[in-house]
Amino acid sequence: MSTIVLVTGGFDPIHSGHISYFKNAKELYPHTPLCVGLNSDDWLIRKKGKFFLPMKERRAIVKELKPVDLTITYDDTDNSSNMAIYKCLQMLSLIHI
């Protein structure tokens, strides 16, 4: 069975603590793909009442970080967090439809 590391959050705005989070995850599992799940703008509005950076911007920044192998986006109002994991596995070709 293949393994992935999935870390999730709003990352709005991205800061040094988030980067340490990604680095630490990658250091713990250096040969395992690191997938970062970003919460949607709607999720951030529900949680904080607003968002600072749109999801497209947050994703563009996060995907350029060295420890990150893959980014996915999701909205946690339903089972979409489960779908986010599924999508990540699919993108890494670990499961097939």
Predicted regions located by residue number:
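Nucleotidyltransferase catalytic core that binds NTPs
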Residues: M1-I95
